[in-house]
Amino acid sequence: MTLTVAALQYCASDDAAATLHKIEPLIAKAAKTAQLICLPEAASFLAASRAQLSERAEWENDSASMKKLAALARQHNVWLLAGSLFLRRCQDRKLVNRGLLFAPDGQVIASYDKIHMFDANVGDGQHYFESNSFAAGSTPVIADLGDIQLGMSICYDLRFAHLYRQLARDGAHILTVPAAFTAVSGAAH
């Protein structure tokens, strides 16, 4: 199977609805030629603080962003990889950085919670401690796109080769690494 892929590169605002409105025409344009459209980590919003993150994270079972992305996948009849959304788990109220793959019918067929948290001082005067905000995932995920198996990861997972070896051993044909690096850490990658 041949799969045409489009990667949308943009920086989300701090407002999920505004970000998703902004990318609608980008998805429509990409869908004219691509079968799989990939969005970055933090696909719907970026928070300026832990308090804002906690306030704006959507419940995993009632996410307006998930509903909108499902509708866009369905409308354009494409696979749509939301690099990640910041969601609140129902069972324990913890936040997760979750990648989601929507099928052309709008159903979520795979979800992956980022395993490796970015806890670092990167040299820009900032300190990043994702583990203070997010619960880490524990399970590698491969999504079935028919003839193609897609291995999911997010951003800082990139630093941990064992994850990609496992995904490859388990049959992944494509490895995705949606990311929202800082300016300093992005230049290093």
Identify what each model region corresponds to.
Residues M1-A6:
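Extreme N-terminal starter segment of soluble prokaryotic enzymes
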Residues Q9-D14:
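Short polar catalytic/cofactor-binding loops
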Residues A16, E24-D105, S111, T182-H189:
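Cys-nucleophile CN-hydrolase/nitrilase-fold catalytic domain and related Cys-dependent amidase chemistry
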Residues A18-I27, L158-R165:
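Short, acidic/polar
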Residues A30, L167, H173:
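His/acidic metal-ligating clusters that form di-metal
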Residues Q35-L36, L150, I174:
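Structural motif
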Residues C90-D170, P178-H189:
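Active-site catalytic loop in hydrolytic enzyme cores
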